[in-house]
Amino acid sequence: MNPALSHVRNWIFDLDNTLYPVSANLFAMIDARIGQYVQKLLNLDAEAAHKVQKGYFHAHGTTLAGLMAEHGTDPHHYLADVHDVDMSVLEVNEALVEALARLPGRKLVFTNGDAPYASKVLDKLGLGASFEAIHDVHATQYRPKPDPQAYQGLCDAYGLDPHASLFVEDMARNLAPAKAIGMKTVWIDNGSEQVPGDADRSYIDYTITDLGAWLHSILETSE
């Protein structure tokens, strides 16, 4: 194990576009369904719905949080609808499965989606038995990443010491609250989110492009 990470006992992973590649286009399908949901709910055309969708995402953390705050949307109905996508696009990444099995300590998924959807994704990826728990949007009381309370709630729920924890995400903005409470942070730079060149990157400890390869590299590094 890389000595710089030898203190890590809790390995926390985002789900979408983190445990599977952006190229699978699974989240792109979900994003499209979210747009359609907003269209139907608010009786808007596609362009107007897209503006509402992205506006809520940036202001509230997720489109769902915005719809709940502004329109009283039922989260269970929303999540069942937008997660009704074809998961045959997902493939098992043997290198990632092996690396996760070798990681010492606890492994958890921290997602703004819900546990039923996350479980289906993990099963398709061959990762159904790789994680101790899934901390989902229901568990955050619908205060999703990057709300700082979501991170503290995760630590409280599982008795995690943030200073002995590492968090992996493809959305850089979701790493800042993790860093603020003492976690090591890993940003997967896979094109799902672009961080401006002049942005403050002090909350990102590691920038990677391939999660499986990076995990193998830290496991095999001794100095």
Question: What is the predicted role of each segment?
Answer:
Residues 21, 109-111, 187:
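Hydrophobic residues in well-ordered beta-strands that form the structural core
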Residues 3-13, 18-97, 116:
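N-terminal helical cap/lid subdomain that shapes the substrate entry/recognition surface
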Residues 92, 110, 143:
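Residue-level marker of regulatory loop/turn positions in helix-turn-helix DNA-binding domains and
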